[in-house]
């Protein structure tokens, strides 16, 4: 193998290592879709909140396949239920919200809202699963 081949092989291996190790440390995000609307949500830290400690819930992207979205007129709500079905939060949603998960268990985060398509608003709802430790 010539010098060019060794450099090319080294660059490929280095790129693969960066991809693998970089992906392991990247913050977690979840994306779900409903009625042509994709919503990406993140819960700090790394989608693994610690019960009893403040976390941030971030709606990082709302992308409709048709129409437009704005937090100003979406009438968005976030409902968080624990594994027993007990609702621990039900309020108007913002792009970033602080929340303390009360105990170590699984939670369902239901994000609802509406997008404008033409002159009408169309509702959507997406569900995310999170486990607090």
Describe every region a protein language model picked out:
Residues 1-5:
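N-terminal secretory signal peptides that target proteins for export/translocation
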Residues 25-133:
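N-terminal soluble domains immediately following signal/targeting peptides that reside
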């Amino acid at each position: 193998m010539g010098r060019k081949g060794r450099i090319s092989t080294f660059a490929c291996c280095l790129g693969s290592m960066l991809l693998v190790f970089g992906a392991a440390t990247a913050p977690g995000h979840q994306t779900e879709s409903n009625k042509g609307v994709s919503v990406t949500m993140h819960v700090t830290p790394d989608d693994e909140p610690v019960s009893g400690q403040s976390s941030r819930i971030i709606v990082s992207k709302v992308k409709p396949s048709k129409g437009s979205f704005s937090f100003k007129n979406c009438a968005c709500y976030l409902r968080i239920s624990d594994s027993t079905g007990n609702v621990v939060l039900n309020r108007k949603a913002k792009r970033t919200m602080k929340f303390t998960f009360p105990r170590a268990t699984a939670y369902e985060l239901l994000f609802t809202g509406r997008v404008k398509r033409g002159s009408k608003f169309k509702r959507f709802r997406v569900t995310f699963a999170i486990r607090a430790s």
